[in-house]
């Protein structure tokens, strides 16, 4: 039997793989609901965004006096007692939960060599688990240095406050507690299907930043020797994310949730995100046994950031596939924020969330494929009521395509950069018509430029969040000349 303290503070059990869906006992469910509600109140009250406002309100109502503070502590104590008390009593009379907590406690205290395998049969909140793999810090990894712009103390302070108070939540909404609470039932159900129906292997990987990553490995059905490592967007989860597209084609895939997403611990700051990506890469090479030459990096949306960084540090990877991504976060952030905040926004992005995918990819010279969403509504810098061709022309993946061609084939784009915009605006039929051979030197250069555009980018007629049709997932091959 688990200790009484483990019954109180142990992780929440969601279910058992291979068995019918678990229904929490009434008392346990009541306790978990109260605990989640209390955690939400604490999260809001202690946040940098709402905390100062709440403090001002409490001060105006004379709640910050000794008597007022005692009243607040009294009600907080009531919630704590009801939440943990109800949950504990519910667990005490639930044999399944007691058995799980006993295994979890033995694993935590390393009392039983078989407890780790036994624990993998359960789906639960990842609290104090022993990871399957611990990534080592690597001082040789290259990082894009922050662009420290000249700014006063006030600007620097406001920029730091903004990125920690609400900027991170806007950039990575998938880490918000409310969204995770709402998504938990769907993620649990999808994770169960991956393990039961697709023989998925759930992994716990610890990054060099100390975050525990929830990951999933799916063995493919085709004869390919390649591994597709999948990177989700800012509100994506491996359970219901981009891993499904290559998996449908029979590829072996490895997906994971970013720090703070799903059951992964931590928060998705840039350093944590990159440490997580490197930890997964280390696992693929050291444990799964894949060579760089057999690894394909596949990223959707903001997942292009860790993909580009990994490609710059592991230049021998087989290929990079980027779906619905962008060149630089700053233009998108400036477009969506009030103009008078522009200086603060620029300082916050460049010094705390410097997601410059184009500069990262400049260090990678291997095969790459961009997938542009024709109905893109997230990565554009045009208002919704503007014509479709205008919105399509402001898709930031267009700038990423130009950056790749400039880095790899500067002689093609020299004096012809507007022709890339022209090609991007063409229909597939128009592009085919311009693929003919011309004897004029300028036309020949333009044809070669269009060939390069065709090689690096394909269009997918969908909006930002539509799952990628598997037929658009093709591993690109390298090409040096056009």
Swiss-Prot record:
Residue span(s) of domain AB hydrolase-1: 231-459
InterPro entries: AB_hydrolase_1, AB_hydrolase_fold, ABHD16_N
Listed Pfam families: ABHD16_N (PF22990), Abhydrolase_1 (PF00561)
Example of a GO MF term: phospholipase activity
GO biological process: monoacylglycerol catabolic process; phosphatidylserine catabolic process
Domain of life (superkingdom): Eukaryota
Protein name in the entry: Uncharacterized protein F37A4.1
Organism: Caenorhabditis elegans
């Amino acid at each position: 039997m688990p200790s009484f303290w483990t019954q109180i503070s142990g992780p929440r059990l969601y279910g058992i793989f291979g068995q019918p869906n678990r229904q929490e006992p009434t008392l346990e469910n009541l306790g978990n609901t109260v605990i989640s509600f209390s955690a939400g109140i604490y999260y809001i009250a202690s946040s940098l965004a709402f905390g100062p406002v709440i403090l001002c309100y409490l001060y105006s109502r004379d709640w910050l006096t000794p008597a007022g503070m005692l009243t607040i502590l009294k009600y907080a104590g009531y919630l704590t007692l009801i939440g943990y008390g109800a949950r504990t009593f519910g667990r005490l009379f639930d044999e399944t939960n007691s058995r799980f907590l006993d295994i979890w406690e033995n694993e935590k205290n390393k009392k039983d060599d078989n407890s780790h395998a036994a624990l993998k049969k359960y789906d639960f909140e990842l609290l104090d688990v022993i990871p399957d793999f611990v990534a080592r810090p690597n001082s040789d990894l290259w990082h894009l240095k922050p662009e420290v712009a000249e700014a006063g103390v006030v600007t620097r302070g406001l920029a730091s406050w903004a990125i920690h108070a609400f900027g991170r939540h806007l950039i990575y909404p998938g880490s918000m507690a409310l969204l995770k609470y709402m998504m938990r039932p769907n993620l649990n159900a999808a994770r169960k299907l991956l393990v039961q129906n697709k023989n998925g292997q759930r992994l716990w990987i610890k990054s060099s930043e100390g975050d525990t990553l929830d990951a999933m490995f799916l063995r493919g059905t085709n004869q390919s020797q390649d591994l597709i490592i999948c990177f989700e967007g800012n509100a994506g989860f491996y359970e219901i994310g981009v891993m499904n597209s290559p998996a449908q084609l029979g590829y072996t895939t490895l997906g994971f949730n970013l720090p703070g997403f799903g059951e992964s611990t931590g928060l998705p700051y840039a350093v944590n995100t990159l440490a997580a990506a490197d930890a997964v890469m280390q696992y693929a090479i050291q444990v799964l046994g894949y060579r760089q030459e057999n690894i394909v990096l596949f990223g959707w949306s903001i997942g292009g950031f860790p993909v580009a960084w990994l490609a710059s540090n592991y230049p021998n990877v087989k290929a990079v596939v980027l779906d619905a991504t962008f060149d630089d976060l700053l233009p998108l952030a400036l477009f969506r924020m009030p103009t008078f905040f522009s200086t603060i926004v620029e300082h916050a992005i460049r010094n705390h969330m410097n997601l410059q995918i184009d500069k990262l990819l400049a260090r990678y010279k291997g095969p790459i494929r961009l997938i542009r969403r024709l109905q893109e509504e997230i990565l554009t810098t045009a208002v919704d009521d503007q014509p479709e061709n205008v919105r399509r022309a402001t898709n930031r993946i267009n700038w990423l395509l130009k950056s790749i061609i400039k880095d790899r084939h500067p002689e093609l784009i020299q004096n012809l950069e507007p022709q890339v915009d022209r090609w991007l605006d063409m229909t597939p039929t128009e592009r085919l018509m311009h693929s003919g051979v011309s004897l004029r030197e300028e036309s020949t250069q333009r044809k070669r430029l269009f060939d390069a555009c065709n090689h690096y980018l394909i269009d997918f007629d969908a909006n930002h969040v539509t799952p990628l049709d598997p037929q658009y997932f093709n591993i690109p091959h390298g090409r040096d000349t056009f």
